[in-house]
Amino acid sequence: MKLEINNAGALRLARGQTLKMLDAAGSTICAREGTVWITEENSRKDVVLSPGACYRVGKSGLTLVQAFADASVSLA
């Protein structure tokens, strides 16, 4: 699957598509459209973001962001 960036600069994820982020501690992930699931390596909690919600990655290592349905996220 290819990654797309929409006109607002958000990364589009198709349903079920997973974004792998390495050593992203301190990065902020914001759901712009759709709902996404986030899990961090060696963390006991997972996070689900609805549109408008943001999450700051707290750990280095692997972070996965997966779209439940078509979604878009911004990264900062």
Residues of each region from the PLM?
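Short alpha-helix capping/helix-loop boundary micro-motifs
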Residues: 4-5, 40-42
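Regulatory nucleotide-sensing modules
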Residues: 9-22
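Short acidic-glycine-tyrosine-enriched beta hairpin
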Residues: 10-13, 43-58
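Glycine- and small/acidic-residue-enriched microsegments that form turns, hinges, and capping elements
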Residues: 13-14, 32-35, 69-70
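Short beta-strand segments in beta-sandwich/barrel cores
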Residues: 19, 35-38, 54, 72
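Glycine- and acidic-residue-biased ligand/ion/polar-headgroup-sensing regions
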Residues: 24-36
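Short, charged beta-turn/beta-strand-edge "cap" motif at the junction between a beta-strand
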Residues: 25-26, 43, 61-63
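C-terminal structural segments of small proteins and small subunits
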Residues: 52-76
